[in-house]
Amino acid sequence: MSSTEPRVAILLGTYNGERYLRLQMDSFIRQSYKNWVLYISDDGSKDQTRAILNEYQKIHGADKIILFEGPCKGCAANYASLISRADIDESYALYADQDDVWLDDKIERTMEFLTAQDQSQAALYMAASIHIDHNGNIIGASALRPRTPSFKNALLQNIAGGNTFGLNKAALDIIRATKDAAVLYPDWWIYIAVSASGGALYYDPKACMLYRQHETNMIGANRGLAAKLWRVKELFFGSYNVLIWQNVTALKTYPFLWTNESNKLITQCEALRAPSRLTRLKAWFSLGLYRQSVFEDIAMLIRILI
């Protein structure tokens, strides 16, 4: 890939990541798309993470790998600090996690979509992933996403990990403008915000990376019966419903960023928590909200009605 291609910012947050960091760093170096710069915010690592990063910076140059001190307020705040930096001014950015391994064409495929869009509008690339365990053994893949991504889907679920995301400048500007949004899951918020703005969305069904699974994300990220049952349990007995309305409340804070159609839908969503079950039922069918399977649609409808 020629250096005349647009320069891409890779945004990486690190914290005590020495165990897998070299594998991820090497996967950046192997990318078929070469015109990138890696911005790393280290959140006060106590292990050899900084030494490893300094080693790669020495080999590849301080203009290729740029290190910052993180705010030491947790993972979400670390990434928020990265995307908010005025000195990161590339027109395209990809998020990365320290434990993963990118496939060699990840940036190239992301940029094929992003550069083809109207750059005055936000654009978001998302993708499937191959799941690996702590030893790098393949243990599965991300759930199938057969339905078209849209705001009506984003209101009910996130469909991809933020570690697969690629954004253009218009999308980055929206995320920067909403950096104080009171939401729990920044990845989900990116999908919501870009879609609410009328931005271009693409979910690539071809895996772009090896996503390392840990005990904390093993069930939620995998597909299959266990994952479906886990999601249904969260829907009925967990905080899922609270999260949806938290996101809706956050959306109401920034109406000037969304399309008229999106703002109308945000207002109409209130009918889904009306006292009358009949009102909620009518609202469900009139709004056209959906998840990625009929099974999950039915579960969502039942949750709304009880």
Question: Over which residues does each language-model region extend?
Answer:
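Nucleotide-sugar donor-binding/catalytic module of glycosyltransferases
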Residues: M1-G224, L305
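C-terminal subregions of glycosyltransferases and related glycan-biosynthesis enzymes
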Residues: W189, R212-I306
